[in-house]
Amino acid sequence: MAEKKNQLLKITALLYAIIAFLYGLNYLFFPELQIKMSGTEPIHPAWIRWFGGAMIALGYGSFRIFRNPAKQGIFVTTLCLGTLLVGLGLLYDPIFNWDSSFNLLEQVIPAIVMIIISFLFWISLRKSKEILW
């Protein structure tokens, strides 16, 4: 029964791990590509390269949850809150600081994905309480 309760948690953790690894590797090793795709003014790649390392670390933690979710409630809570804040942060500029130079797909689609993942982590927290805490 406990395995059924944490199935959503495992799927969500694996999905987030894959997304975090892909974005992390891209930001860490190819920041110039991200800058070019954003359509904004060029910046020094080091300004966003650090973000790649942080994303890889979060992806690794999420993969660890996928493998063994026992007693990982605090990390799942952190991922739930973090993905929500990232999603809302990505939506801020298109809503409040609209500029025709924005690459809307690069901001809105990841924002929606992060908000959905946050919601899935939140549901997983509720369903898997006895496993996570």
Question: Locations of the language-model features?
Answer:
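Membrane-water interface at the C-terminal end of transmembrane alpha helices
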Residues: V113-W133
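Structural signal for membrane-spanning alpha-helices in multi-pass inner-membrane proteins
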Residues: Y27, G61-F66, L90-P94, S118-S124
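Core segments of alpha-helical transmembrane spans in multipass integral membrane proteins
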Residues: I18, L22-Y23, P45-F66, C80-L88
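Hydrophobic alpha-helical membrane segments
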Residues: F51, F75-Y92, I112-I117
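Membrane-helix boundary elements
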Residues: N6-T12, A20-P45
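Non-cytosolic membrane-interface motifs at loop->transmembrane helix junctions
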Residues: K36-A46, F75, D99-P110
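Interfacial segments of alpha-helical transmembrane regions
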Residues: K5-A17, I74-L79
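Membrane-helix boundary connector in multi-pass membrane proteins
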Residues: F66, A70, L88-E106
